[in-house]
Design a protein with these regions (language model features):
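Basic, flexible Lys/Arg- and Gly-enriched helix-loop patches that mediate nucleic-acid binding at interfaces
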Residues: 19-261
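Short, Lys/Arg-enriched N-terminal segments with co-localized hydrophobic residues
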Residues: 5-18
Length: 261
């Protein structure tokens, strides 16, 4: 049984544009936002994917003209995956645990679920299985961290083509160099590459507001160092349309079914 969901890219040859070379089905599914490549391989292996009506096989290649269908089991598995919003405290790492430091996912327990969570999702230990951070937040930073089982959300937030905004409040010390604020907005480079334009404004005499559309390692701290400032506190308060809001530090809640980044 298949769903009435058809995923197909435009027929480029109809516009006089040469067809692209065939690529792996799993890559095409990720490009279309159906799921992550790892999830695609799992669905294909289970026989949950059809190409032009025929059950797909691992390693199969497709073109933009091919029709891709997911069956009911794949759709149900996606629907059961959860995304969790955590207000990460200092001292926890976003990803795998490191020496002397705990992983943020260890905070996802029934006891730490925020009593203001209105999602009506009952916590189950399986919700921590394959739960991965969709983006980093430094060990010495606090605020909104997204942990998800859904590869589509991870791709949206941290994929190569991600354009999701991330908003931060940043406390600083030091003396801002001449033209420093303008450089923070546009004109700095890290790791030999120009940074995308940002939105950086003063909130008060020692706090800046950053809105970024990329996430290089320790990006804000390194940007500030380039203009004579030292970051003494960093808090992420928004990712896309999802705000940290009143979520207490160390607590978490589920992303609601109608929640969209």
């Amino acid at each position: 049984m298949t769903l009435n969901l058809v995923f197909r890219l435009p027929h480029s040859h109809k516009k006089g544009i040469p067809m692209t070379d065939p690529i792996r089905l799993s890559k095409r599914m990720a490009e279309l936002g159906i799921c992550s490549r790892r999830e695609a391989d799992s669905y294909i292996e289970k026989g949950w994917v059809r190409v032009n009506g025929t059950v797909a096989i691992l390693g199969q290649k497709v073109t933009p003209a091919d029709r891709i269908d997911l069956n009911k089991q794949a759709h149900e598995q996606q629907a059961n995956r959860v995304t969790i919003l955590l207000n990460k405290p200092i001292g926890f790492v976003s990803g795998q645990p490191e020496k002397d430091y705990r992983a943020a996912v260890e905070l996802i327990t029934a006891e730490n679920q925020w009593d203001g969570d209105t999602s009506r999702i009952a916590f189950h230990p399986s919700h921590t299985r394959n739960l991965a951070p969709a983006g980093r937040l430094d060990i010495d930073s606090v605020g909104l961290l997204v942990l998800t089982q859904d590869g589509r959300i991870a791709k949206q937030l941290i994929g190569d083509n991600s354009n999701s905004e991330k908003e931060y409040l940043v406390r600083v010390k030091g003396s801002l160099k001449e033209n420093g604020l303008a450089l923070l907005n546009h004109g700095l480079s890290l790791d030999g590459e120009p940074l995308r334009p940002a939105q950086v404004t003063w909130q008060n005499q020692d706090q800046l507001r950053f809105v970024l559309r990329q996430g290089k390692k320790r990006q804000i701290r390194r940007m500030c160092e380039l203009v004579g400032l030292r970051v003494v506190g960093l808090k992420r308060i928004r990712i896309g349309r999802i705000k940290l809001g009143a979520l207490p530090q160390g607590k978490w809640r589920y992303l609601q079914a109608n929640g969209r980044f």
